[in-house]
């Protein structure tokens, strides 16, 4: 009998697990309008600069500027994700929170292999994060360390490690180990200059030099520097140093962008080998900023890899995406190549992206003219890679290329202007572009001459972006676009003449995001208002007032329960279970935990007006998980907090309706949401 009971219990557990797993596989996860399918985005909320890029123990760490309580830039934290392949990402909890020294601005992370800091406590090498803290505009540099592969972090008791020397803008430290002199080197943005510091232990830093006066572009404040060495044309005996700098305004295509310098670094000073007024732009699009490279890539790999923030400070806060805002670019490999005009940085997509290709389509030796039938008329998609090689001569079409994400009155042109020898992206007809007047500025161009009579285009299209690599990455254009979901067409075109296409391959690219981490035995969740998202903590809702989401399930008598956590963010208000609701959440019952007023409350909405039925006074803390359960039978309602009966009340206004969730003046998360009839 005991054995039979154990078997039944095991079977019940398996069935329950299967039910949760099936319900968790909600196809709506990472499927909102404009949601990138293979680019990194946070599950919810605002993101900007990538930070703390470090590789350790088989994982690429991506930290990023993150506002957990809003869709616009706000109090900065470090969000965190890891990847084993640069393609699929695992979301992790926030790594660094603001403290009395300020919010957490951009910075870097390193593996302290020799334990120079003395932070190591176990067998794992310490990861050390170096970041800016901003308190009401006063910026200093601080550090934190991790002894568990970056899962938890301890802030150094001696912070800040570099106090402010009297500069308004003093931020974004990028640190690397300089093996030749066995020391750490930091590059730090200060106004429109880069300051260089050195250290033996990551805790005490010495000022070494300054770079930037009268060098390159000074259209805006300099930010997010990086400094690294690369071989020229792969020759290990010929190496040069690259200084990458983000510029807050005045970039080549308007607004924020990136420039770089090529030269020499002797351990304390960087020297630009080009004329001071020569500006080398990293990307000619509107939407590539704050890119920094991963540190500690193994010598067996030796690639210099990075990614950037795909947005522009002119309109970043207004881009109409929800429940998240902003994406990173695809990861790219950086190389130095010698051209007739000098040594230049080239960027190519990482080879790992080839693993998400679907069934490819190929064409060879096509001739395209304005009168040609669109050979790509049968192609449809919103996430794909294009590889094309065109033969170009003085008699070729004046313009040729692709129209991607085409639909009714929508398309984005990615092409080549032969007469002016320019690669271009034109998003003026790409879709939603009225949210900010700075967004639709027409065509972005990059100088690109044919090589041996050929022009190569490699184009990555996602639901809200295009990244174009011309002639094996010599020039790059990165732009976000916002077409309708239905705009999935593709066209190969030529204007004012014909052009020969030597080869063309289109690779569909697969979605890299898996099943939702939100656990519930109900489906069909539909947002009524506010901002809702599935996150690693559960279903997150955020609103300054009342916000609702409803499932497709309904009932009259039931047990309905959930884990609820009110986050320490905007409002510190309440999270609620809603039941017997109408389809608009204007009428129905709610049971909540209220951190603002320290109570559990049972109330109802009648035509949108709230009235309290019963309440129980008890401390409700933010960032603490509570289990709230409601039992409904006829007109009687029992409400339990952490399995303790706190309210037993009667009301007969509503007899049945839908199940849902509510937040009021808060960011709250709900997990393990279940109902039993």
Curated annotation (Swiss-Prot):
pH dependence of this protein's activity: Optimum pH is 5.5 for inulin hydrolysis.
GO molecular function (one): sucrose alpha-glucosidase activity
Top-level taxon in the UniProt lineage: Bacteria
Gene3D superfamilies (alphabetical): Exo-inulinase, domain 1, Glycosyl hydrolase domain, family 43
Signal peptide feature range: 1-24
Protein location: Secreted
Family, per entry: Belongs to the glycosyl hydrolase 32 family.
This protein's name: Levanase
Organism placement in taxonomy: Bacteria, Bacillati, Bacillota, Bacilli, Bacillales
């Amino acid at each position: 009998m005991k054995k039979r009971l154990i078997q039944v219990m095991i079977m019940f557990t398996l069935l329950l697990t299967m039910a949760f797993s099936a319900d968790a596989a909600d196809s709506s996860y990472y499927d909102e309008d404009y949601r990138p399918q293979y680019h990194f985005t946070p599950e919810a909320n605002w993101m900007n600069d990538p930070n703390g890029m470090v590789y350790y123990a088989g994982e690429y760490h991506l930290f990023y500027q993150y506002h957990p309580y809003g869709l616009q830039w706000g109090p900065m934290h470090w969000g965190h994700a890891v990847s084993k392949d640069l393609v699929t990402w695992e979301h992790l909890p926030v790594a660094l929170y603001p403290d009395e020294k300020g919010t957490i601005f951009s910075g870097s992370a390193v593996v302290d292999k020799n334990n120079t800091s003395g932070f190591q406590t176990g067998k794992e090498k310490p990861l050390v994060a170096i970041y800016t803290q901003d308190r009401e505009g006063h910026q200093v540099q601080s550090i934190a360390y991790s002894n568990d592969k970056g899962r938890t972090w301890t802030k150094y008791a001696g912070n800040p490690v570099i106090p402010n020397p009297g500069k308004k803008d003093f931020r974004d430290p990028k640190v690397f180990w300089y093996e030749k002199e066995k020391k750490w080197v930091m590059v730090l943005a200060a106004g429109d200059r880069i300051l260089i510091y050195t250290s033996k232990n990551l805790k005490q830093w010495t000022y070494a030099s300054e770079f930037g006066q009268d060098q390159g572009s000074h259209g805006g404040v300099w930010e997010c520097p990086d400094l690294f060495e690369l071989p020229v044309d792969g020759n290990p005996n010929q190496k040069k140093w690259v200084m990458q700098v983000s510029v807050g305004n005045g970039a080549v295509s308007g607004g924020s962008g990136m420039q770089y310098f090529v030269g020499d670094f002797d351990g304390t000073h960087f020297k630009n080998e080009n004329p001071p007024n020569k500006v080398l732009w990293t990307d000619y699009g509107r939407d590539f900023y704050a890119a920094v490279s991963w540190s500690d890539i193994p010598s067996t790999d030796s690639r210099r890899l990075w990614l950037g923030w795909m947005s522009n400070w002119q309109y970043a806060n207004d881009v109409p995406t929800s429940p998240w805002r902003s994406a990173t670019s695809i990861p790219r490999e950086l190389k130095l190549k010698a051209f007739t005009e000098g040594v230049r940085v080239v960027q190519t997509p990482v080879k790992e992206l080839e693993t998400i290709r679907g069934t490819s389509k190929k064409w060879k030796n096509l001739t395209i003219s304005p009168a040609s039938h669109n050979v790509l008329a049968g192609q449809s998609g919103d996430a794909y890679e294009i590889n094309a090689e065109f033969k170009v001569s003085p008699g070729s079409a004046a313009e040729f290329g692709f129209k991607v994400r085409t639909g009714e009155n929508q398309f984005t042109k990615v092409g080549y202007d032969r007469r002016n020898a320019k690669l271009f992206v034109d998003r003026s007809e790409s879709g939603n572009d009225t949210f900010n007047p700075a967004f639709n500025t027409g065509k972005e161009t990059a100088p690109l001459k044919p090589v041996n009579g050929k022009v190569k285009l490699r184009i990555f299209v996602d639901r809200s972006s295009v990244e174009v690599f011309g002639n094996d990455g010599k020039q790059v254009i990165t732009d976000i676009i916002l077409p309708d979901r239905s705009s999935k067409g593709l066209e190969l075109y030529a204007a004012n003449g014909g052009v020969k296409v030597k080869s063309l391959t289109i690779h569909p690219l697969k979605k890299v995001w898996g099943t939702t981490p939100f656990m519930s035995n109900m489906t069909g969740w539909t947002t009524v208002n506010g901002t809702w998202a599935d996150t690693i903590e559960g279903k997150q809702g955020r609103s300054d007032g009342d916000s609702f989401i409803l499932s497709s399930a309904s009932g009259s008598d039931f047990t309905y329960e959930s884990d609820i956590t009110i986050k320490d963010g905007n409002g510190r208000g309440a999270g609620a279970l809603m039941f017997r609701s109408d389809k608009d959440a204007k009428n129905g019952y709610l049971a909540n935990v209220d951190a603002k007023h320290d109570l559990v409350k049972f109330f109802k909405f009648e035509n949108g007006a709230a009235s309290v039925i019963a309440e129980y006074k008890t401390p409700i803390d933010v960032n603490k998980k509570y289990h709230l359960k409601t039992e409904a039978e006829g007109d009687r309602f029992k409400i339990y907090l952490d399995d303790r009966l706190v309210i037993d009340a009667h009301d007969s206004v509503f007899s049945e309706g839908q199940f849902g969730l509510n937040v009021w003046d808060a960011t709250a998360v709900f997990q393990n949401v279940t109902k039993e009839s």
